[in-house]
């Protein structure tokens, strides 16, 4: 790495990146700790109260599970989980559908009850309104007929009055001529 690159790295506060192809220190160091070689907790020198057979019995279920898992690559477990998931989803949809159906029925029943209540309360009011409208229409026709009759009577009275005025005027004219 050049001097300039080193200065840039110091200024930016970043650490130098190690290239992937370079061997790590573990390969150079022969004493590197391999987790598979040494257990995290050493039981040999600690004076364990359990015997070796107890330890072996404790490891057997874990090893058996590991072999089962490695044996079928987890596809059986995944298929079981997938099947369970599908069943859960289908059950959720069924319960959701049932809930929606019950809500829909409840709303329909509520609407039907409101409609019957409305018809009960306002049906008679509507019927009375129709009767009043018919009565009003009949009265309108009657008053229209009476108004026409009164107009005819007034028209004849006006004509009679005009004739009487004309006759009175003619009499006055003849009387004035005579006198």
Curated annotation (Swiss-Prot):
Residues 1-11, 56-75 have a biased composition (Basic and acidic residues). Keywords: Chromosome, Coiled coil, Nucleus. Residues 1-75 are annotated as: Disordered. InterPro entries: XLR/SYCP3, XLR/SYCP3/FAM9_dom. GO terms for cellular component: chromosome; nucleus. Residues 146-175 form a coiled coil. It is found in: Nucleus; Chromosome. The keyword Iron does not apply. Expressed in testis (at protein level). Also expressed in ovary. Not detected in other tissues tested. Residues 42-53 have a biased composition (Low complexity). The keyword Coiled coil applies. Belongs to the XLR/SYCP3 family. This is X-linked lymphocyte-regulated protein 5C. It comes from Mus musculus. The gene is Xlr5c.
């Amino acid at each position: 790495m050049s001097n300039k690159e080193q200065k840039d790295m110091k200024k930016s506060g970043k650490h130098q990146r190690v290239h992937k192809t370079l061997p790590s220190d573990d390969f150079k160091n022969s004493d590197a700790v391999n987790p598979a070689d040494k257990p995290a907790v050493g039981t040999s020198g600690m004076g364990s109260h359990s015997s070796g057979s107890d330890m072996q019995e404790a490891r057997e279920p874990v090893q058996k599970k590991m072999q089962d898992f490695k044996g079928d690559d987890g596809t059986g477990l995944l298929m079981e989980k997938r099947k369970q998931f599908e069943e859960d989803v289908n059950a959720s949809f069924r319960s959701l559908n049932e809930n929606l159906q019950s809500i829909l029925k409840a709303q329909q029943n509520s609407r039907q009850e409101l409609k019957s209540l409305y018809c009960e309360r306002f049906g008679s009011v509507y019927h009375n309104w129709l009767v009043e409208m018919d009565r009003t229409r009949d009265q309108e026709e009657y008053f229209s007929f009476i108004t026409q009759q009164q107009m005819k009577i007034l028209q004849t009275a006006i004509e009679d009055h005009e004739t009487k005025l004309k006759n009175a005027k003619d009499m006055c004219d003849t009387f004035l001529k005579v006198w």
